[in-house]
Structure formats: structure tokens, C-alpha cells
Amino acid sequence: MATKFPKFSQDLAQDPTTRRIWYGIATAHDFEMHDGMTEENLYQKIFASHFGHLAIIFLWTSGNLFHVAWQGNFAQWVADPLNTRPIAHAIWDPHFGEAAIEAFTQSDASCAVNIAYSGVYHWWYTIGMRTAADLYQGSIFLMVLAALMLFAGWLHLQPKFRPSLAWFKNAESRLNHHLAGLFGVSSLAWAGHLIHVAIPASRGETVNWGNFMSTPPHPAGLAPFFSGNWSVYAANPDTTGHVFNTSEGAGTAILTFLGGFHPQTQAMWLTDIAHHHLAIAVIFIIAGHMYKTNFGIGHSMKEILKTHRSPEGTPFGGMLGAGHDGLYDTINNSLHFQLGLALAALGVVTSLVAQHMYSMPSYAFIAQDFTTQAALYVHHQYIAIFLMCGAFAHGAIFFVRDYDHEANKNNVLGRVLEHKEAIISHLSWVSLFLGFHTLALVHNDVVVAFATPEKQILLEPVFAQFVQAASGKALYGFNVLLVNPDSAASIASDYIAGPHFWLDAINSGVNSLFLTIGPGDFLVHHAIALGLHTTTLILVKGALDARGSKLMPDKKDFGYSFPCDGPGRGGTCDISAWDSFYLAVFWALNTAGWLTFYWHWKHLSIWQDNVAQFNESSTYLMGWFRDYLWLNSAQLINGYNPFGSQQLAVWAWMFLFGHLV
């Protein structure tokens, strides 16, 4: 008799209802619940799957390189980055008839093509690639790497090459390996690539495998390194008149601290970026030698956590209970806790990437490709919200499956659970506070509608303006730190050798560094904060109530996602941890919408040299509806109509699709 799906659960396989299919799909990746699963086998399966994941990533990036090399216009774009639209790939089967084929035959292409708004052209150009041959080589290299990863995944499932459970539980060795080996050495390697390949390329010099060993990146070679005269590497940087990809105005420096942006490319100086990666490498390689492993020297994570509490007699002495005692084993024995921490950290980093990619662009000319800037910001913020929601989902699963009350008695984790009502009620209060203050947008809408705009509530974000002023923004008239030439900060910065451009960048008005903010920004800030805090409230409540609540004290016995109306008692609909995650995703998407709309309109006003429109219209609802949404979507809605279609047609469909969802 043929084995029915799912093979991993005999109970489900014998279920005569459609639950067999739906529960089978839902639990396919829930390895720890599969029949016959041991803890060691669980770790081995997940470890091997990481190699598969890496293989997919390398295959995908290889495909990007291959299709641009084959069907793109990289060489033409390199010749004129500001006036050539980069092609991602051809469209094999353009729909919507002849009009669509004509509309999508763009950027001097001979057939229908998609334009690249991912920024990959800018990245490849910045790191030293110049021809389609370079892209093909990169593609082949990544394809080989993908094959190696697949082999490594298969190999680590073979009995002789399966790591033991003790190997997986060796947290200090793993931490050292990740800090020094992955972060440290990869940062050092990247600094090396920038210094040896990218910086020479930006100065019109091609470095490849043929001349790599015979072309020193600096005329002084390694002598200054070994003699300790490192400042030589910062001397003679590129001038403000440097023309990227040529020797005109180029210097010889490889590691600088210039600050600000290259005037032509509007991106950070490559020599600053190389310096940053070298510094990161040094810090992480040192950090990766801090923890006690085979040699019996260094820190013990367990001891650090055990003693991490305020001593008696100090201000917080005794107030924090057992502190972090017990956390080492709790975290080390729970994959869900580890995954939750990893997702939370990655979520924060992804949001930071979104913020930094536009405010401090690293790639040549990307700041002048406005659609790409918008696409990358939206992409990274949406990725960030999903990662953050996932962090709380796995935090809730940890509380249901892995939390041991006795092992965490009176420590920080136990105490969080014990006073969860206070945490939840404070989050609720903060959300209400932010919501009521956001209603100023509605008040302003009413008074503008009744032709009394002077009655609007318009508050300047003085504290944020003060922070910007302290960093060097002179517009607001504060006399503090870097805007005050006589302050200690200004005097100290004058002593840093060489030219510096950070104050020029902060005060330029045409980039996105320290955007000028006013009452509209202040109101939107509170609206976005409302969305973030409400999302957090739902996620935190779902996780902290996952084990049990007043309504259902024994909730942990029913798992993470028990059915609506649940185990034979009424009123359990919408109270599983799964339900709170589901609701939080709605709020997270809502918040990401507000956030990206704000970012987009703010930047449209800068790019169109019309900041007055944002400043005047962003303080009331109709301003947003009329001057942002309607004004900027009219063209899109006409992507297709009875008279034909244009290249926005596909996005017009997406516009409809998004609203139908």
C-alpha cells in the first residue's frame, strides 16, 4: 500500500478528512514534531538545510549576473550611468498586445525588456566591474559555489560527517567562529577587494587576476604598514574634482576619513568605505578571540550571564532578582529562542539598511536614480517587518514548547512573565497616547476644510532639530556642538588631519542626510510610532500570553496554533499565539504603508525641488489624499485604458491587485 502524505506523521497520514492535507502542509517544516525525531537529528537536519539555503542564494545571485550579462546593457550603462536606464532582462512573452511590446521596448533595447530598479548595476560598477565578461565570470563563480554548497549539505547528512549534538551546543566556539571567521575575515576580505580592485577601478585602472599580484594598490606598498607610518595611506585622497572611473582628479589614498559624499557620484568616498570595513574586521577578529574554548582561556558565557546582576548595596542591588542566571542553558537548549533573537537582530539591521541606503548611499550614482532609491527603501522596510514579526512568533513558540519555569525562577525571563500585565498595559497606554496625538491630523483637516488653516496645530520637532543641529545642521539656529565653531566638538574635529566634508553634506539640502523636518514630519512621526507600538503590543501580548492567560490558564497545553473556539470550551477564538501574530502582521503592513508613503512624498518634494508642497500639505489628511496619493497615482491608474497601454500597465494591475487584497 502506498504511503499517504505526510510521511513524517503517521497520525495525520491516517486522518480521513482534509485535515491530513492542511495540517500536513502546515507542519512540513516543523521538524521537531515529526515522528521519530531526536534532538541530535533535528540539529543535523537544520544544519544541512542551511547549505541548501546558501545554494539557493548563490544560484539566484548568479542568475542576476548571468541575465544582465546576456540580455542587459551594462557596458552602455557604465559609459553613461546618469542617462542610461539599466536593463534587468528581456521579457519573453509580453502581454497586452502590440502597444505593450512597444511600451516595454525601452532603453535602446531591440525587444521588450524590464528595467532594473534593484541597484545591482550601481553596486557592480562601484566594486570594480566594467564589462559583461566580468559579470559572466561572477556568475560562473557563484554557480560553482552553489554546487559546492549543495554538496556540503548532502555531505553533512551522511553518517560519517554528521556533527554531534555536543558540537551544536558548543556556543562559545560557534560565537568565536561567527565573530572572527565570518564577520571579521569576510570584512577583511571585502576591505581587501575594495583596496585592490574597486578603488583602482574608480581611478581608471583595471585590476584583474592577470595583474593582481603586480599592481600594488598604493605607491608606497607595504612599507608604511610595517613601519607603523599608517597615515601615509590616508594622504593625497581623491579631489572634489575627481571624475569617477578616470584618473582625472584622482589621488593615491586607500584608507581615509573624509566624510560626506563624492561630488560627482553623490555616494560615500570609496576610501572611507574601505577604511570602515578594515576597522570592522579588526574589531570582530579581536571579538572572536574573547570566549573560552579548547584552550581554557577567555570568557565563559555561562559565568558572565550568571554574575550579570546588580550587587547588593548598589542602586539596583537585589531589585533584579537572579538577573541573567539560567539564561545560558535556556537559550542554548531552545532553537526557537535562538531563532527569535536572530530574527529580531536581522529585522533591526534590515531596517537600518533601508535607512542608510538612502541617507548615506554607498554606490556610485545610485542617489540620482530615484526609482531605485524608493524601491530599495520599500523593499528593506517590508522585509524588516516580516523578520520582526517572525521573531515574536518564535518567541511565543519558545514559551509554549521550551520554557522551563524552574530553570528561570526569579531571573529576568521569569520576572518578565510575572509582570506581563504591567508591560502590556504600558504598551497599551503608549499606543493610546500616540493615537490621540496623531488625531491632530484630523483636527487640522477640519479647520482647513472650514477655511481657517491658521487654526492648525503645528508643532516644531524641537528635540529632533536639536539633535540634527548638534550633528552640524545650521538651518535651525541652535548654537550647539558642531554648529558652534567654538564648541569642544568643533575644535576637536578641526584637529583631524586632512580635508573633511561631513558638514558640507549635512547642510547641502540636495541629499537625504539629516532631512529638514517640521510640523508635518512631527505628526507623521507620531502616526508611524502609533503603528509600531500597536504592532509591538499585539506581538508582545501574544508571546507573553502564549503559556496562559486569565481567560485560558492552561493554554500552553494546546500548543501554538490551536483551532478557533478550541478545545471544547467557548470563547477561545482569537487567543492563540498564532492569532496575535496574524493580527500583528496586518498592523505591521499598515505601518510599513505609512512609513513608505512618508518617505516617498518627503523625497519627491526634494527631488522635484518642491519642499513647500510637503511642508504645507502634510499637516492635514486631505493634503495627503490630494497632493500625494491622487496627484502621484493618476498617471499609474492610466497605465492601461481603452486607448491602449504604456510601460506602467503592469504596475496599474499591481495597484488594483494591492487594493483588492
Swiss-Prot record:
The PsaA/B heterodimer binds the P700 chlorophyll special pair and subsequent electron acceptors. PSI consists of a core antenna complex that captures photons, and an electron transfer chain that converts photonic excitation into a charge separation. The cyanobacterial PSI reaction center is composed of one copy each of PsaA,B,C,D,E,F,I,J,K,L,M and X, and forms trimeric complexes. Gene3D superfamilies: Photosystem I PsaA/PsaB. PROSITE patterns: PHOTOSYSTEM_I_PSAAB (PS00419). It comes from Prochlorothrix hollandica. It catalyses: reduced [plastocyanin] + hnu + oxidized [2Fe-2S]-[ferredoxin] = oxidized [plastocyanin] + reduced [2Fe-2S]-[ferredoxin]. The lineage of its organism: Bacteria, Bacillati, Cyanobacteriota, Cyanophyceae, Prochlorotrichales. One of its GO terms (cellular component) is photosystem I. The chain crosses the membrane at residues 46-69, 135-158, 175-199, 273-291, 335-358, 374-400, 422-443, 522-540, 580-601, 648-661. It holds the Pfam family PsaA_PsaB. This is Photosystem I P700 chlorophyll a apoprotein A2. One of its GO terms (biological process) is photosynthesis. It is an enzyme of class 1 (oxidoreductase). [4Fe-4S] cluster binds at C564, C573. InterPro entries: PSI_PsaA/B, PSI_PsaA/B_CS, PSI_PsaA/B_sf, PSI_PsaB. Coiled coil: none annotated. It is found in: Cellular thylakoid membrane. Belongs to the PsaA/PsaB family. The keyword Iron applies. GO terms for molecular function: 4 iron, 4 sulfur cluster binding; chlorophyll binding; metal ion binding; oxidoreductase activity. PsaA and PsaB bind P700, the primary electron donor of photosystem I (PSI), as well as the electron acceptors A0, A1 and FX. PSI is a plastocyanin/cytochrome c6-ferredoxin oxidoreductase, converting photonic excitation into a charge separation, which transfers an electron from the donor P700 chlorophyll pair to the spectroscopically characterized acceptors A0, A1, FX, FA and FB in turn. Oxidized P700 is reduced on the lumenal side of the thylakoid membrane by plastocyanin or cytochrome c6.
